[in-house]
Amino acid sequence: MNNIVARATVALERRRDDAASTPLVRDDAQRSIDVIQTFQRSANELDLWQSSYAEPPARPAALNINGVEISVFPDALALAQVRGDDRVGQVFIRCTIGQQGDAAENRRAEANGHLATIAHIHATHYLTHRGTPHAPTSIVLDVSRQQIIRGPANTARRIANIEMACTMIAALWPSA
């Protein structure tokens, strides 16, 4: 993970310091650097170093759930060894601030839980060559809230809910 963060920071610093870049691009680069630094502090405080991390595939295959195609672009792969078993999951880093209040926080928590579950489903389809897909190894790191949301150990209920939602979406949205 440190190599990924270091490469991203160097690229952003180049963009920020490039006189040919527009003020908007330079400002965006600086804000991205600030987010990366916040992420690093969060990663240290949340003890994310139980796993090793690798770059995800450049063009991950789409996930098709009951006729709905879902693009899944993780920020990293998580690789862990538990009791001699190589486990794999996907990592999503969320840096959005979002709204305050209990209702907004509940929606955010639910969305992060669904994202962690979708990451696990995607891993079961496309990452078995890297290890055994393991739901708790797929995580969403909510940087602004300094929270880790892991895929649930028992995924059956959440997967059934996602499948049902996709069935409804496929029935309602006309296909091209």
What are these regions (language model features)?
Residues 1-176:
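Electrostatic, structured charged patches in enzyme active sites and in nucleic-acid/phosphate-binding
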